[in-house]
Amino acid sequence: MASKGGREKIKLESTAGTGHFYTTNKNKKTTPEKLEFMKFDPKVRKHVLYKEVKLR
């Protein structure tokens, strides 16, 4: 039987305050720091900073 992976689901939430988010997963062992990406927010129609928050 395979062991459980070390990956955790995360939510990347827009810093523009629109409430838009992307979901993804990351390996906690290789990247323990919080992720930040410039991604497209369709509500403001611009690329904005998305920061990692825990998926509930």
Swiss-Prot record:
GO molecular function: structural constituent of ribosome
Protein keywords: Ribonucleoprotein, Ribosomal protein
Biased composition (Basic and acidic residues): 1-12
Protein's UniProt keywords contain Ribosomal protein: yes
InterPro entries (UniProt xref): Ribosomal_bL33 (IPR001705), Ribosomal_bL33_CS (IPR018264), Ribosomal_bL33_sf (IPR038584), Ribosomal_zn-bd (IPR011332)
GO biological process: translation
Region (Disordered), start-end ranges: 1-27
Record's GO cellular component terms: cytosolic large ribosomal subunit
SUPFAM superfamilies: Zn-binding ribosomal proteins
The keyword Ribonucleoprotein belongs to this UniProt entry's keyword annotation: yes
HAMAP family to which the protein is assigned, alphabetical: Ribosomal_bL33 (MF_00294)
Family: Belongs to the bacterial ribosomal protein bL33 family.
Name of the protein in its database record: Large ribosomal subunit protein bL33
Source species of the chain: Leptothrix cholodnii (strain ATCC 51168 / LMG 8142 / SP-6) (Leptothrix discophora (strain SP-6))
